[in-house]
Amino acid sequence: MTKLREFYRCETCGNIVEVVHEGAPSLVCCGKPMIKLEAKTEDQGQEKHVPVIEGADNGFTVKVGSIEHPMVDEHYIEFIEILLKDKVLRKELRPGQVPEAKFCESKSDIIEVREHCSVHGLWKNK
């Protein structure tokens, strides 16, 4: 059973979807069940992947990793997403951009911060 805000990936074509209406027993793409992505918080390479929140209560910046993540065609951060009490905000990134996002929200409303690396998958910080 899918749940709200879960991510799934197609192993055939690479499509990634986020559940906005929960309840489907499974998600299918390219004729095969999609794989649920589990967000990592620690692992080899965490210094380049775990989102870091910086800033005050009236706005903040999310940087990817304590060491800046590469942003090249074959290895980059695809998006940074924050889950707040009543909404979700996402910044999509491209190779060559700085792996960070600025948000004008209250830091105290953050439930979770996530990012997706094109090579190493989904990472989070609470």
Label the model's feature ranges.
Residues G23-P33:
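Cysteine-rich micro-motifs
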Residues V64-V72:
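Short amphipathic, basic-aromatic surface patches that mediate peripheral association
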Residues V19-G23, L37-K40, N125-K126:
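Short Cys/His-rich "knuckle" micro-motifs
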Residues K63-V64, P99-S106:
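Exposed aromatic-hydrophobic patches
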Residues C10-C13, C29, C117:
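Short cysteine-rich clusters marking metal-coordination/redox-active sites
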Residues S118-N125:
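Short acidic/polar inter-strand loop motif in beta-rich domains
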Residues M1-T12:
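Intrinsically disordered, low-complexity linker/tail regions enriched in polar/charged residues
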